[in-house]
């Protein structure tokens, strides 16, 4: 919708607070533009709703439930992520 003219295919976008509000809107827009969204949220139910909406726009999402204020949790969960092209630190 918002980023239709931007091609983000083969790019990975990490979005914190992706389950609600601005983070959610950014996640959907990035997915529409072709990015694979690495969505971080504290609640799995919010991530599941986001995943449904991203699939509606034919996007890809990697869901990660974690609290970014907990450094150990964040480090452990993101250790498997090899590349981040875009960061939305919400």
Enumerate the predicted regions with their spans.
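Flexible N-terminal pre-Rossmann segment of NAD(P)-dependent oxidoreductases
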Residues: 1-12
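Conserved glycine-rich cofactor-binding loop
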Residues: 12, 17-21
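Rossmann-fold scaffold of SDR-type NAD(P)-dependent oxidoreductases
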Residues: 16, 84-90
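Aromatic pocket-lining residues of Rossmann-like dinucleotide-binding sites
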Residues: 30
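The beta1-alpha1 cofactor-binding region of Rossmann-like NAD(H)/NADP(H)-dependent oxidoreductases
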Residues: 45, 64-77
